Each structure stands twice: as C-alpha cells, then as structure tokens.
Amino acid sequence: MQVATTKQALIDALLHHKSVGLVPTMGALHSGHASLVKAARAENDTVVASIFVNPLQFEALGDCDDYRNYPRQLDADLALLEEAGVDIVFAPDVEEMYPGGLPLVWARTGSIGTKLEGASRPGHFDGVATVVAKLFNLVRPDRAYFGQKDAQQVAVIRRLVADLDIPVEIRPVPIIRGADGLAESSRNQRLSADQRAQALVLPQVLSGLQRRKAAGEALDIQGARDTLASADGVRLDHLEIVDPATLEPLEIDGLLTQPALVVGAIFVGPVRLIDNIEL
C-alpha cells in the first residue's frame, strides 16, 4: 500500500492505473469504512482512500471544539485500510489541501445543503462539496463510495456531479450497525458506555417507524419526535420523513404510499449523532 501526503505524490501513484474507486474519509475509521473499501475493491482495479479532516465543513471553518476534538489516529487508520485492501492512501495536511489559506472559490450547495443537517450546521455541505470536488479532480475516480448513514451528503454529492458534469459514479453503501443497533460512526468513540446506551433510542425510533410502514399502519412522526425529545440524556435536533432524492419533507396524511427516508439527528452529551432508515 502506498501512502501519499502531497498532491503530486498522489498523481504520480495513479499513473497507468486502470479503473479507480475512491473512498473519501476523515479518518477515525471503523467497520463502516471497511465496508466502503470492500465495495470499491469489488468493482475497481485500484482503490484509493483519502484521510483528511476538512476544516471547511466544521463550524467557524475549523475554529471550534468539534474540529479540534475530532478523533485522529493515522497509524490505526492505515492499518485498517491496508488490511481492507486499499492500494493508495492520500493523507494530506491542511496546508497541502488549501495552500495559502482558505479557498476563494467554493462549491455552493444551495437549498439541498441548507435543510436538515445544513440548517443545524450552516456551511457544512459547502465545505463537504468543495473538498470532494477537489478530491475528484485529483484522483479522477471512475466510482466514489459514500456511506448511506450520511444520506444528505450522498444527495449533495449526487447533485454536485450532476450539476458540474463530473464523470464519476456515486455508489452509496448500506449503513453498518453495531450489535446493539447503533450506526457506526467515528463520533461513537466520544460516547461513554452510558451515553451509548442512551443513543440507542434513535435507531429504535427509526426501526419502529419502518415496522409501522411495513405493517400498513399510519406513521406518527410527531410521536416519534416526542419519544426522542423526552429520552434521558438526549436532545433532539431533527426528525423528518423526506423524499430520498431531494430530501424535501413529505407531508404524511395517514398512510405513506411512496418511497421515503426518515432522517434524524440527536445530541447525547456534546456528541451529535445522525441516522436514517428507508421506509
């Protein structure tokens, strides 16, 4: 496995490669990331993974505790990626990605990036889209792999490549969950055992809505919100039933008769967790 820390080293490493699959990450890797690599490995001659904690997608452009406290464990991440079968790792520092300071030209995500997660984290998806566009330009992948846990990110990236005519196929990969049902996330490392137990109310509420839909029962989204809002140690950010492509909230009057996604975010202590499930 090659490790490139500069753009030029990455470009050199990619010379003469055939089909390329890209797995963009911010490090602090877990089994969910390994599943992305597995999917990329099955469809491409060469698999590239990036590790970069992107300040542009954090509050105050990284001048915040969430960015400073984000887990960084490069040696462990490299070991996981090598075992998973990655060929090339791109692990630049901030100066390499943004030489001379923050970029003047950004990818602006408009309405799809300002609702749900974007409403709670203004500018987040502009930062995501900007760094992903840079990675696409550097790697020139045939396919790129993203976890379905970040459903809005997948929708934003799909729109990015469609609107800017970037020739890459976007491949969402299903959510990986722990034995207790909690969606795998790098932020889970910051939960105590008690906080992890409290966080389980989110996947439980989501799966409850899914069961009601499968049984042909009416969905009580407000009741689901109330359950989350009243749970011990939990603060509700949002819970919505949305169109899977546009993420526009769906007005549910009785039974749900169209494909939909229920997306939610909660705080457990200082840790913000997201999850979603198909209905």
Curated annotation (Swiss-Prot):
It catalyses: (R)-pantoate + beta-alanine + ATP = (R)-pantothenate + AMP + diphosphate + H(+). It comes from the Bacteria. Its EC number is 6.3.2.1. InterPro entries: Pantoate_ligase, Pantoate_ligase_C, Rossmann-like_a/b/a_fold. GO terms for cellular component: cytosol. ATP binds at residues 26-33, 147-150, 176, 184-187. Its main location: cytoplasm. One of its GO terms (biological process) is pantothenate biosynthetic process. One of its GO terms (molecular function) is ATP binding. Disulfide bonds: none annotated. Pathway: Cofactor biosynthesis; (R)-pantothenate biosynthesis; (R)-pantothenate from (R)-pantoate and beta-alanine: step 1/1. The keyword Ligase applies. Beta-alanine binds at residue 57. Pfam families: Pantoate_ligase. The active site is at residue 33. (R)-pantoate binds at residues 57, 153. Keywords: ATP-binding, Cytoplasm, Ligase, Nucleotide-binding, Pantothenate biosynthesis. Homodimer. PANTHER family: CYTIDYLATE KINASE/PANTOATE-BETA-ALANINE LIGASE, PANTOATE--BETA-ALANINE LIGASE. Belongs to the pantothenate synthetase family. The reaction proceeds by a bi uni uni bi ping pong mechanism. Catalyzes the condensation of pantoate with beta-alanine in an ATP-dependent reaction via a pantoyl-adenylate intermediate. This is Pantothenate synthetase. It comes from Corynebacterium glutamicum (strain ATCC 13032 / DSM 20300 / JCM 1318 / BCRC 11384 / CCUG 27702 / LMG 3730 / NBRC 12168 / NCIMB 10025 / NRRL B-2784 / 534).
